From Swiss-Prot:
GO cellular component, one term: cytoplasm
Pathway: Purine metabolism; AMP biosynthesis via salvage pathway; AMP from ADP: step 1/1
Organism from which the protein derives: Bartonella bacilliformis (strain ATCC 35685 / KC583 / Herrer 020/F12,63)
Family: Belongs to the adenylate kinase family.
Name of the protein in question: Adenylate kinase
InterPro entries in alphabetical order: Adenylat/UMP-CMP_kin (IPR000850), Adenylat_kinase_CS (IPR033690), P-loop_NTPase (IPR027417)
Stated role: Catalyzes the reversible transfer of the terminal phosphate group between ATP and AMP. Plays an important role in cellular energy homeostasis and in adenine nucleotide metabolism.
HAMAP family in the record: Adenylate_kinase_Adk
Enzyme class: transferase
Keyword set includes Metal-binding: no
Record text about domains: Consists of three domains, a large central CORE domain and two small peripheral domains, NMPbind and LID, which undergo movements during catalysis. The LID domain closes over the site of phosphoryl transfer upon ATP binding. Assembling and dissambling the active center during each catalytic cycle provides an effective means to prevent ATP hydrolysis.
Gene: adk
Residues covered by region (NMP): 30-59
A Gene Ontology BP annotation from the UniProt entry: AMP salvage
Length: 192
C-alpha cells in the first residue's frame, strides 16, 4: 500500500502516518524527519536544507525529490509506504509519478486532512508547550514566524495538489479537526 497524507503543518499528518505504519506494517517516509536528520548530522544537503527550513520556506524540489527517490528504493518500502510531507507542490507530484513509474509502483490513495488554520496555531502552541514541559528541544520550524510562513507556503504551493490528485481520482478528504482516533478510523475506512 502506497499512501500520501496531505494537510497543512500541524494537521496531524505525522501522528496519522505513525498509526498507519503500525496498522499496515509499512514504512513512514517523512521528508521532514529525513531533512531534520540530515541537518542534525550536518551533511551537505542538510546544511542547504537548514537555511530554507529555518526561514519557513520550502526546500527546493531537486533536494527533496532525490531524498524521496533514494528512500523509496530501500528494501523496507517494497510492501508499501506512507509519504508524510511530500509532495508539497504539483512539480513534486509530477516528479513522484515519474519516480514511481520508474520503479513499477503506483499510489493507492492520497488522503487530505482538512483543518481550520486558527486551530492549527493552537496545536503548534500546545506542541511547543508540551516539548518545553518535558525539557525537549523545540523544532526550529515551530516558532511563530516560521509557522506563519509555512502556512502561507502551504496555501500558495501545496493547496493545488488537492486538485491535481482529485483530477486523477486518488484524493480523499478527512476531517482533521476530529480527535486522533476518529481521524484514524476515517482514514482506515477509506483504505479498506
Amino acid at each position: 500500500m502506497r499512501i500520501i497524507l496531505l494537510g497543512p503543518p500541524g494537521a496531524g499528518k505525522g501522528t496519522q502516518a505513525r498509526m498507519l505504519m503500525e496498522r499496515y506494517n509499512i514504512s513512514q517516509l517523512s521528508t521532514g524527519d529525513m531533512l531534520r536528520e540530515a541537518i542534525e548530522k550536518e551533511t551537505e544537503i542538510g546544511k542547504q536544507a537548514k537555511i530554507f527550513i529555518e526561514s519557513g520556506a520550502l526546500v527546493p524540489d531537486f533536494v527533496v525529490n532525490q531524498i524521496v527517490s533514494d528512500r523509496i528504493g530501500e528494501g523496507d518500502c517494497v510492501s508499501g509506504f506512507i509519504l508524510d510531507g511530500y509532495p508539497r507542490t504539483v512539480g513534486q507530484a509530477e516528479a513522484l509519478q515519474r519516480i514511481l513509474q520508474s520503479k513499477n509502483m503506483q499510489l493507492n490513495a492520497v488522503i487530505e486532512l482538512i483543518v481550520d488554520e486558527d486551530a492549527l496555531i493552537e496545536r503548534i502552541k500546545k506542541r511547543v508547550e508540551e516539548v518545553v514541559a518535558v525539557g525537549g528541544k523545540i523544532r526550529s520550524d515551530d516558532n511563530p514566524d516560521s509557522f506563519a510562513k509555512r502556512l502561507l507556503e502551504y496555501r500558495e504551493k501545496t493547496v493545488p495538489l488537492s486538485k491535481f490528485y482529485s483530477n486523477i481520482g486518488l484524493l480523499k478528504t478527512v476531517d482533521g479537526m476530529a480527535d486522533i482516533a476518529d481521524v484514524s478510523r476515517a482514514i482506515n475506512a477509506i483504505l479498506e
